[in-house]
Design a protein with these regions (language model features):
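Acidic, low-complexity/disordered tracts enriched in E/D and polar residues
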Residues: 130-235
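Short capping segments at the starts of secondary-structure elements
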Residues: 234-244, 248, 254-255, 406
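Short amphipathic beta-strand/extended segments with alternating polar/hydrophobic composition
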Residues: 218-227, 420, 424-433, 626-635
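Hydrophobic residues embedded in beta-strands of well-ordered beta-sheets
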Residues: 215, 284, 615-619
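C-terminal structured domains
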Residues: 508-779
Length: 780
């Protein structure tokens, strides 16, 4: 059953959301609040996928010890057994509920899988789809719905490594929300109805600067304004509707009440034709979308229109209530379908979008949940990884500084070129170099981040030292490499306070909580997100006491940021997920059309001046505040640095690298896709034999995480499973067809399923991950 949307349990003290606890023997501090992420289904579910007879039969055949008939028999037996398990799985109520939330198209094939018969090729395809969903739900620690509930944890407050208490259920609290694009579509429909736009907010474009009684456009052209135009624009803040603007002009600026409404309408339409103004629902791309729409409707002064639109909001709320009350997958699908039908009937738009894209917010609603547990990560745990984690954090500081330095060098050159084109005495603005600056991060040519990554790889190679060919494990101690690491990763002060927070994702290799507390465990550094506070998760703001998580980060760091106001179509900019959450004190860089409901917080790029003195560029905003280039571009640098920072050895086969009790890098293979040597035409049994031979030749584990070039994240593949080997073979063929030089990245599954320590109240164990934040100090 979907849990009701309730207030989150106070499991942590939010006053501890700051760097509080020293990593022993270093000047790094761990923040006092972390996040436990986990799978929503027990890890034991992985045992439902896989072959028992075919792998051995394939090995015997490859060694010349078995026959094709023996393999054929074993393979068909495994296919039938796995198909039977998948058919039974298709009836599992909890799995059906998870899939109903995520993909109703897949949900609708589950009954046909559970029933016998049907066309074999279609049935096998559906089995592959279900198997891939199941492995994801059992093997990946996520933060989405009840199939990935998170839990806030206390960090460093207790001595024992891990203390955990469970409630009776997996999920303690849930919240269902409309996707931002859903809200925007409803709001746009409202604003487009006859006579409605008057009750919605006009806003001066983010990339246009109002300077007295003239506008400065992004291309530096100026538009002289009539006095009344300037007065209207100063009030067009993206939140006031035209009626509210009119009232202020009458009350504060002496406009004649009799003709003010017509005059304001005339001004707004004139500015709209000049394309310096937006006049629509203006729903920002963040988790406040529903709140903003409610505010829009509440401000409508036309009684008939207000009642009509208020009824729409009430109907949306009713549909959300039905979704929350759904007690089964079938009831959930019925409720979701009803919401879809209402949305289509109301807006005339499709009820889904961006099919197949990750982080896109494809359907109308989403649900976030909290796990029903309370957990403390104690000092014994932190002390065990303090020295190696501090060494990695030193490397992250170096990487952030080096990336910022490379970006600054490029931007200085851009500013100088722009200055040479200007008339004497004319300052360069950020708008003059903004397109080229963005290209430094996401353009087609050689980016600064690519150079920084290459240099980082060389530095890790120098620190780790020579690794013999064929080695599968490299075990190092901090004492062995600390002098080299301090020299190699030496760097100055971090160039911006907002590049000074690093976020490790840790996985614990242990069979139980008792094993962890007894010191019988290993810790894996899954990733370290450099220069980024990854606990800044807007979709969990509802769980975090008062205020947003971004506000808490800014308070702890002691400063606000300049955040680029990204347009709606920007990658991963869906509302629930955003590249750069915006805090209450942050100011925004306006560089294109983009919705936001507080125009006074936007700094148009054309109004930010860039001046050079003694080789240093200083950015000055309209309030007179100055910033270095790294401070100006800190958010962009952070977005890129967080995924670019890597540890390990760039070689076809890289061994597992362990530093004291912290695994820095899992054993990894980067293999040419053509090396699988599949025949051009698919054949299930032949493909299985070919893949099993490839696994054996490269000494790969039977279960491994696999990533193809076009994929965002790796997926678990069981190379004993007839179902998943067939999927893998299809992906290999597709990759080779797209790029003959494509490589497949394979990494060991660490922790192994039996080493998943996180239990529930029933004793089942779950894949999990601990997300922490560390910083050297609170920057001044």
């Amino acid at each position: 059953m979907t849990a009701p949307a309730v207030e989150a349990a106070r499991a942590v003290d939010w006053a501890d959301f700051a760097p509080l606890h020293p990593l022993a023997g270093s000047d790094w501090q761990v923040w006092g609040v972390g996040l436990l992420r986990n799978a929503g289904f027990p890890v034991s579910g992985l045992d439902l996928i896989g072959g028992t007879s075919a792998p051995a039969a394939a090995a015997r055949l490859a060694a010349g010890e078995g026959t094709a008939e023996e393999f054929d028999t074993a393979y068909r037996a495994d296919v039938d057994a796995e198909a039977a398990r998948l058919a039974a799985l298709a009836t599992d109520p909890k799995l059906r509920l998870a899939i109903a939330w995520q993909n109703r198209t897949v949900f609708r094939i589950l009954d046909s899988l559970a029933a016998p018969g049907g066309k074999e090729t279609k049935r096998r395809q559906r089995e592959r789809t279900l198997a891939m969903y199941w492995l994801r739900y059992c093997a990946k620690a996520e933060t989405i719905g009840f199939f990935g509930p998170g839990a806030w944890i206390g960090v460093g407050r207790t001595q024992e490594a891990i203390g955990i208490d469970h409630g009776p259920a997996l999920v303690a609290a849930a919240r269902t929300s409309l996707e931002r694009w859903t809200v925007a579509a409803i709001a746009d429909w409202m604003a487009e109805q006859p006579g409605a736009r008057w009750w919605f907010p006009p806003m001066l474009r983010p990339d246009v600067h109002l300077d007295g009684e003239q506008l400065v456009l992004a291309n530096r052209k100026t538009v002289r304004l009539r006095p009344e135009d300037a007065q209207v624009l100063r009030l067009a803040d993206g939140d006031r509707n035209a009626e509210q603007i009119t009232d202020l002009l009458i009350a504060d600026h002496g406009w004649d009440a009799a003709g003010a409404r017509g005059a304001v309408d005339k001004v707004l339409n004139r500015l709209l034709r000049q394309r310096v103004l937006g006049w629509d629902a203006n729903i920002p791309v963040d988790v406040r979308a529903e709140e903003v729409l409610r505010r829009r409707v509440s401000a409508i002064g036309d009684p008939e229109m207000f009642v009509r639109y208020d009824a729409v909001l009430a109907e949306l709320a009713r549909h959300k209530g039905e979704i929350d009350r759904a007690g089964s997958a079938e009831q959930l699908v019925e409720a979701l379908d009803a919401l879809d039908a209402y949305f289509v009937e109301t807006t005339g738009q499709a009820a889904s979008r961006e099919e197949g894209k990750a982080y896109a917010g494809r359907t109308l609603v989403y649900q976030d949940t909290l796990r029903d547990c309370r957990m403390e990560l104690g000092r014994d745990f932190l002390d065990g990884i303090a020295r190696p984690l501090a060494l990695v954090a030193d490397a992250a500081d170096w990487f952030g500084n080096r990336l910022a330095e490379l970006v600054e060098t490029e931007v200085v050159a851009l500013v100088r070129k722009a200055a040479a084109r200007q008339r004497p005495g004319t300052a360069v603005t950020l708008a003059d170099v903004w397109p080229q600056t963005l290209a430094l991060f996401w353009g087609e040519h050689n980016h600064p981040v690519q150079q920084a990554v290459r240099e980082l790889a060389l530095k890790w190679r120098e620190v780790i030292g020579e690794v013999p060919d064929g080695a599968t494990r490299v075990d190092l101690s901090v004492d062995q490499i600390i002098d080299s690491a301090k020299k190699v990763f030496a760097t100055g002060e971090v160039r911006s306070p907002h590049l000074a927070v690093h976020s490790p994702d840790l996985q614990v290799v242990a069979r139980s909580v008792d094993a962890v507390n007894g010191g019988q465990h290993l810790v894996v550094l899954g990733e370290l997100h450099a220069c980024l506070a990854t606990l800044d998760l807007p979709f969990l703001d509802w769980t975090a006491d008062t205020g947003s998580l971004r506000d808490k980060v800014n308070r702890a760091i002691g400063g606000e940021r300049l955040v680029p106001l990204l347009p709606v179509g920007w990658k991963r900019n869906s509302g629930r997920m955003v590249p750069a959450p915006i805090g209450a004190g942050d100011r925004l860089i306006g560089f294109t059309r983009a919705p936001f409901d507080q125009r006074e917080r936007i700094e148009p790029a054309v109004a930010i001046t860039l001046t050079e003195h003694d080789g240093t560029i200083t950015a000055t905003t309209t309030d007179g505040r100055t910033r270095t280039l790294s401070e100006l571009l800190a958010v962009l640098i952070s977005i890129i640095a967080c995924d670019a920072f890597k540890i390990g050895l760039d070689r076809p086969h890289a061994p597992r690298v362990t530093l004291d009790d912290l695994v820095l890098f899992r054993e990894t293979w980067r293999l040419p896709a053509t090396g699988v040597a599949l025949a051009p035409k698919a054949d299930r049994m032949r493909d299985y034999l070919t893949v099993r031979r490839w696994v054996a030749d490269n000494a790969l584990p039977d279960r491994a995480f696999v990533k193809f070039p076009e994929e965002t994240k790796p997926s678990l593949v069981d190379f004993t499973s007839p179902t998943l080997v067939l999927s893998f073979a299809n992906l290999v063929r597709r990759a080779v067809q797209s790029d003959p030089d494509a490589r497949v990245t394979v990494s060991e599954p660490l922790p192994a399923p039996e080493e998943s320590w996180l239990p529930d109240a029933d004793g089942e164990q779950y894949v999990s991950e601990l997300r922490l934040q560390i910083s050297r100090k609170v920057p001044e």
